[in-house]
Amino acid sequence: MNGKYYYGTGRRKSSVARVFLIKGTGQIIVNGRPVDEFFARETSRMVVRQPLVLTENAESFDIKVNVVGGGETGQSGAIRHGITRALIDFDAALKPALSQAGFVTRDAREVERKKPGLRKARRAKQFSKR
């Protein structure tokens, strides 16, 4: 990557995304593959593009993303968070609009741990009265 770039780290569930914005044509590369090839679900692709569409920068930047951990939903959310932070690095005036949409806030929800004596985090064994 030559020249000026803008960087943002995004996190969601157990996924971490490192996002680099470079002036360009709107190409999004995730782990060396185009975003449409990387994500099978259309909703995941939409989530990734949300901050760009909101700020009308969809065709202004080429985006290079490195994402590790988690599944499709977590990774797309982490990329969205990273793109949002990189856009704020590019222009701080975009922050109020991105905040209003809820993209700046890190979604702190994580998987609840399994407890001993239960089948899952909250699911108990079936109780039989007789």
Curated annotation (Swiss-Prot):
Family per record: Belongs to the universal ribosomal protein uS9 family.
InterPro entries, per database record: Ribosomal_Su5_D2-typ_SF, Ribosomal_uS9, Ribosomal_uS9_bac/plastid, Ribosomal_uS9_CS, Ribsml_uS5_D2-typ_fold_subgr
PANTHER family: RIBOSOMAL PROTEIN S9 (PTHR21569), SMALL RIBOSOMAL SUBUNIT PROTEIN US9M (PTHR21569:SF1)
PROSITE patterns referenced in this protein's UniProt entry, alphabetically: RIBOSOMAL_S9 (PS00360)
Keywords from the named record: Ribonucleoprotein, Ribosomal protein
An example Gene Ontology CC term for this record: cytosolic small ribosomal subunit
Protein's recorded name: Small ribosomal subunit protein uS9
GO MF annotation, one: structural constituent of ribosome
Signal peptide interval: none
Pfam families recorded: Ribosomal_S9 (PF00380)
NCBIfam families for the chain: PRK00132.1 (NF001099)
GO biological process, one term: translation
Keyword Ribonucleoprotein: yes
